[in-house]
Regions:
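Bacterial Sec-dependent N-terminal signal peptides
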Residues: 1-9
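C-terminal motif of bacterial Sec signal peptides marking the signal peptidase cleavage site
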Residues: 16-20
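Exported/periplasmic ABC-transporter solute-binding proteins
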Residues: 22-35, 39-314
Length: 314
């Protein structure tokens, strides 16, 4: 009895196999087409889910703090800063903006929030966020250099009058040398040709402080300079541009860092700027945000609070 049941099962399996092999080309094609159609339908259904973004969401505005050179340059270049009836410059950044006190703070805030927008030094841009094009122009060393990307500013070395400290004089000469400017370019900034340089090997300690945007480049320059002149000690303190300038004038810093032009009042107080390099200001959004381009007027509207949702800039 067991042998008979096995024989029946084998025969049934063989019949099914022969039926499948004997399928007509038309039925096979139809079956294949049905499978393909089903796969295409599934893919079409899944595609929007992968890029789903609600444009009606409120924009989370991320800004730098008062005193930041990046903020100062950004609001000037975008028109967020404007003169009032008395002719005084006023920063019209929306009060709803979330304030971050460093470049890394802005990067973290934007990367963790799909509705956020921020601005940072181009040299600090990484893959955690997306830089939008401005007026259709992508931020890069080349577009900053040729002027087609308009959100750009200088990185300044600041001293109290002419530098007098031997280490400061030698270090600044290194920064402006062929090697120093090449390093700036390698780090993603826009350096100059640079001058010939031979270290005088001075000994002593200086303190360099200021802008958090300039700080990453300055750190690289200090590391490189120490290999040229091991006799010197350089301490780097990262704060902001305004503190960088005031620190030089009150003696806290030997050299200041500012990621903006000096104010008239600072120059009148004795501050002297030397352009270390040029840098773009990248406007950044989350990698999950489909927005790829903004106009300067749209950026201004977002930061003054006139445009409040992502639908307003589509």
């Amino acid at each position: 009895m067991l042998k008979r049941n096995v024989s029946v099962a084998v025969a049934a399996a063989l019949a099914l196999s022969l039926a499948a092999c004997g399928s007509s080309p038309a039925s096979s094609a139809a079956s294949s087409e049905a499978v393909s159609s089903e796969a295409a339908s599934s893919e079409a259904t899944a595609a929007p889910a992968a890029g789903d973004f609600d444009v009606d969401q409120d924009i989370t505005v991320i800004s730098r703090e008062d005193g930041s050179g990046t903020r100062g340059a950004f609001i000037e270049l975008t028109g967020v800063e404007a003169k009032n009836d008395a002719g005084e410059k006023v920063d019209n950044t929306t009060e709803a903006a979330a304030i971050q006190s460093s470049t890394n703070g802005v990067l973290t805030a934007v990367s963790n929030d799909e509705t956020a927008i921020g601005y940072i030094s181009l040299g600090s841009l990484n893959n955690d966020v997306k830089a939008v094009t401005v007026e259709g122009v992508a931020p890069s060393a080349d577009t900053v250099k040729d002027g087609t990307y308009t959100l750009a500013r200088p990185f300044n070395i600041v001293t109290n009058g002419e530098a007098a400290d031997p280490v400061a004089v030698d270090f600044i000469a290194y920064c402006m040398s062929t090697d120093g400017q090449a390093l700036a370019t390698e780090e993603g900034y826009i350096g100059d040709v640079g001058a010939d340089y031979t270290s005088t090997q001075p000994a002593g300690k200086i303190v360099v402080g200021g802008s958090s945007s300039v700080s990453p480049l300055m750190e690289k320059l200090i590391e490189a300079y120490k290999t040229v002149n091991p006799n010197a000690t350089l301490e780097l303190q990262t704060t902001d541009s305004t503190t960088g300038v005031s620190g030089v004038l009150d003696g806290t810093y030997t050299i200041g860092m500012a990621s903006r032009e000096l104010k008239d009042s600072e120059v009148e107080g004795g501050a002297k700027a030397t352009v270390l390099a040029k840098d773009g200001i990248a406007v950044i959004v989350s990698n999950d945000n489909p927005t790829d381009n903004l106009t300067v007027d749209q950026i201004k509207g977002i930061y003054t609070g006139e445009l409040t949702t992502w639908a307003d800039v589509q």
